[in-house]
C-alpha cells in the first residue's frame, strides 16, 4: 500500500517529470497512474534471495544505464550496490537484524548482508519512525542527517467505522 500511495501522489503532482516504473513481473495497468510513467518489466521475477541478487545486482544496473535516471527510488529498501546512480531507499525497519530467526534462513542472511550495504550506498534513506531512524543509524553507523522520517499516511479509502459496527 505504501508504494501505491506514495508513487500515485508523486507522479500526479509532478506531471512534468518522467518516471520509470520497474516491475519484476507482468503488472496491472492500475499501477500506471498517469501518462508520465514508462513501465518496464525486468526479469527474473525477484521472489527469492538468489533472484533478488540477480535482479538488483546484475539486471537492474543494465536497465538503469539505459534509462539514466536522476534518482532511483526504492520503496522497499532494495537498491543496486553496483549502480552509480543517486538513490533514495525506504527502509521500513530492520527487525531482521534483531530477530533473524523469524525469517527463513536464506532470506535472513540476505537481508543482514545486503541491507547494511544498501543503507550505506543510498544517498538518502526514508524510514517510518524516529525509533527506526535511530536503529538504522546506530546499527549501520549511518549519519542521522542521511535519514528522514516520513510517517505512514492513511489512504482516502479509509473511513471511520460506525460505533455500532465496532
Give, region by region, the residue ranges found by the protein language model.
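Carbohydrate transferase catalytic cores enriched for Leloir-type hexosyltransferases
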Residues: 1-166
